[in-house]
UniProtKB/Swiss-Prot annotation:
PANTHER family on file: ANAEROBIC NITRIC OXIDE REDUCTASE FLAVORUBREDOXIN
Full protein name: Anaerobic nitric oxide reductase flavorubredoxin
Positions of Fe cation 3 binding: C446, C449, C479, C482
Binding site for Fe cation 2: D83, D166, H227
Gene (UniProt): norV
Main localization of the protein described in the UniProt heading: cytoplasm
Residue span of region Zinc metallo-hydrolase: 30-210
UniProt lineage: Bacteria, Pseudomonadati, Pseudomonadota, Gammaproteobacteria, Vibrionales
Keywords, sorted A to Z: Cytoplasm, Electron transport, Flavoprotein, FMN, Iron, Metal-binding, Oxidoreductase, Transport
Amino acid sequence: MTIHVKNNIHWVGQRDWEVQDFHGTEYKMTKGTSYNSYLIREEKTVLIDTVDHRFSQQFIQNLQMEIDLQSIDFIVINHAEEDHSGALSALMEKIPNTPIYCTEAAIDSIVGHHHHPEWNFKTVKTGDSIDIGNGKQLVFVEAPMLHWPDSMMTYLTGDAVLFSNDAFGQHYCDERLFNDEVDQAELMEQCLRYYSNILTPFSALVTAKIQEVLSFNLPVDMIATSHGIVWRENPTQIIEQYLAWANNYQEDRITIFYDSMSNNTRMMADAIAQGIHDVDPSVAVKVFNVSKQDKNEILANVFRSKGILVGSSTMNNVMMPKIAGMLEEITGLRFKAKKAAAFGSYGWNGGAVDRIHARLTDAGFETAISLKTKWRPDGKAMRECREHGQQIAKLWAVKDKSTLSTPVNAFQSATPIEGIEAQQPLTETTPTADAAHSADCQCMVCTVCNWVYDPAKGEPNQGIEVGTTWADVPDYFLCPECHLGKDVFVEYQG
């Protein structure tokens, strides 16, 4: 089955209505997903990406019904993850000498997944292009850490279609392919869920990459993603939304999540929520039990919130395991400009609350006062919990509501972003490293995201003191922006 996208572009992907888990079991899919592959037939025939490996044979059968596989002139792999390149091994068995265009980093990951170093790889970088005939070119734009080091986007001139890889996508399955055909509230929900759970750690890179693409002043008539719908009507609305999400996004919202052995901490959570509402009824307050509710929905609400409260019973003087796991995920997602507080019940001592407070502080949250209740909360303790909620509401009140993000419940037609207008040739550009560094500063720059390590500043968040030379930086060091190791750094040349 194929779906006509535009002119000589067809969707040849695979819908997956039944899938529930992604990245192991870390991401729960509530609406299925699609693995989007695109066939372009100009004077040259090009296949962009494949599908998940579980659908390899079905994908090839469908493709053979559409074209002679031998007519494929080359394959573009925007990303090597198995849900993008999974059918590549089966396809290459039938057309083994077909060139594969990808980034240099993708060769390593493709070979690592498929174990075929003899394949005909062609390395591309930002600004490289291929003439596919009829006056059209494919132009490549590297997008490292969105969300893998090997990621790139591909732009088709003439048709003005951006094959955006994982960016602007969503795990959302529908028989209809285009954004203007589906339920807009459902689409927004899945886009936000996808961004908040997968792309949040790379928000600074999202902004930089979007600004780089906008600087090319290319027309964008469609954005063809790797998962979910194709953005056909006002495609730049999702670009605008990504820029908003990447800019320390927060609504007038507070999220409370907890785990409880005997419902004591649940009682506290309910009373705290009531106290917040007493003081500021306009604040959206959501309460979640991490043992019973969707973890990814909780994380999406954390992303939307100006502050969170995390509660746990104390077990063996530590927090409940599911709360510990959630805090580990929150630390990895690197939320910015948010407040937090801990609460919980205990019998012998309240170690869980202290540990939660410490973890939230380490994760970069601005932490407020904690609250502990011994045994099952009685009337006095419940009043204290409600008063605590009232105090939190006052402490976290935003005087100027205009500084908060406006919740968007559905996509709507909007004015396209300025800057995506006339088509011009692409030239290679890279994000500019910190201009404050001199050429003789003995700095090191990350080749993936351009973050600069300066010995004069150190990296206090990883315990690296001011004055530490690169040779003395420990091997466990990770780039604060892209979280890759020392091996991706090179000497800064100014």
